[in-house]
Amino acid sequence: MKIIGLDFDNTLTNYDNLFYQTARDLALIPQNIKSEKVAVRNYLKSINKEDEFTFLQGKVYGERIAEADQAKGMYEALIDLQCKGYKLKIVSHKTKYPIKGYKYDLRKGAIEWLSKNKFFNKNGLNLKRDDIFFESTKELKIERIFKEKCEIFIDDLPEILNLIDPRIDRILYSPKNDNNKYNFKKIQEWAELISILD
């Protein structure tokens, strides 16, 4: 049984709408900003309010994470993988609390999102809590991927994939296809995953 490791933030989840809505609710951005995390960040940076974005991240990843969308087609793709005999493990670089702002328990929030989205349901993905790992540093994340014997790892950050042992099959999830300088296998949509593994 092959083990597939999965990143969490911006790989299983899509925060674009939630970043936009939370920033609007806090009156941090005008309405005409694009409903994307990057657009919100770039706007706040352009008006010298980068600290507000750091605060916003804590809100989104903590207090409001339950409102985050699934990455399009992700859940169906993971069901397909399980049907083909793959074992799923989630390995995320996620600190317990945000860098700034209120001390939301980010890991607890992520578990609640996974629960809400049927990752633990017997009639869903039926993952166990010990299939989920949150690590405090990128280095510990890389170690965990190795310890859990992941043969494949999917992440939205090429800098993470660059650190992973090249004997592990590394797949870059890049919905906007904006990481062309990297030679990893790449998917823009989760629906493409099965075809590049077969």
Model-predicted segments: where are they?
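Short catalytic/ligand-binding loop motif for oxyanion handling, primarily in non-cytosolic enzymes
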Residues: 13-15, 97-101, 141-143, 161-163, ...
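Asp-based, Mg2+/Mn2+-dependent phosphohydrolase catalytic module
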Residues: 146-147, 157-198
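Substrate-recognition "cap/lid" segment bordering the active-site pocket of phosphatases
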Residues: 96-150
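Metal-dependent phosphoesterase signature
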Residues: 29-30, 38-79, 86
